[in-house]
Each structure stands twice: as structure tokens, then as C-alpha cells.
Amino acid sequence: MPINKVVKNAEEACNGISDGMTLMVGGFGLCGIPENCITELVRKGVKNLTCISNNAGVDDFGLGLLLQTKQVKKMISSYVGENDEFERQMLSGELEVELIPQGTLATRCMAAGYGMPAIYTPA
């Protein structure tokens, strides 16, 4: 049975998100990010999230909002250079971080969508 992917608002879109989930968050830089859904996740207080995204936002915008409230336990990303809170949490060991090249990130996301168990890239 097909899933209805049309929702009325961010609250409805985030209803199925709970503690410990892995979320792939869209956008490039600060453009095209799901701002309303991120705000809703902050409001809901879900925690221990693993976030997969091109970037980590900035201190007061994008995924930076979830980092400020310490709702992210692991970040898988290719660029994180503009977020001071991210840097603080990473250096203190509060945040698990997996930095990967942008092309590898895109390929891993594509492979996951295809159900491929592995991809091979040069070392």
C-alpha cells in the first residue's frame, strides 16, 4: 500500500521521528534546508539523533539549532566549517563526527537508496 507523502505542516511531517533515529537532512549550505521541520524537532525535543547532511548549519540556523540543544549525537557530513557549536562539541567529545568528501557522501546516499551494502572508493 503506498504511503501518502503529502502533509499539512511540519508537525505532521515530524510525527514519526523519535529518539535515536537517523535523519538525512536536505539542503546545500543554508539554502533549501527544512527549516520548519528542524524547528519542530527542537520543539519536540527528540534526542540522540544521527544527522546525515551536506553541512552542519551555523550556530543559530539549520542543524545548528539541533546542535545547540544537544539533540544530535552523531553527524555525518562533508562540510562543517561555519558552526562554532559543532566545533566545540566535536573537540570536547560530546559529538561523534564522520567527515567524508562531498562526492562520497552523495554516492553513499545513492547506494543506500539502491540497497547496496557497500561502495568502493580510492583510499
Please provide the spans of the model-predicted regions.
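Conserved alpha/beta enzyme-core scaffold
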Residues: 1-123
